Amino acid sequence: MIKRILKLLTAALCVASVLQAADAEKVNAMVMINMENGLANIQKGFLYNNLDLIKSGVDQVQKENMVYHDRNVIKSILPDNRKQMENLALITSKRIENATEEMKSYIALKQMKKAHSSFSDIVNACTDCHTLVRGW
């Protein structure tokens, strides 16, 4: 009887961990889609001289990026063979945070070339992380 209970408990824990991993992947996919949307809005804002679109894009990127300030979240979404890159992902999220704050400051000062440079820093941070985590 005890063996059966232990087997059921073990099976339940396995199912729970698989479901949790699947949930983490879904959350990560949604965050990435929303960050992409924010980046696209920033770029469109620069192309069409639309400050409101730039600002809303920056706000969206900042909001979604907050997810990656938590080490446990990062660990849950990194592939098993990339778990050691947790610090890189955390550093990247801080780079994005700094670049978005810098971008807001430059926009407030009407220094659009510098604001666009900050946008490039955001995209470069994303690319650096994706390069290492995805093994590009």
Language-model features and meaning:
Residues 15, 120-123:
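Processing junctions and N-termini across compartments
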Residues 1-2, 19-23:
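Basic/polar N-terminal segments that are highly enriched at the extreme N-terminus
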Residues 1-10:
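Bacterial N-terminal signal peptides that target proteins for export
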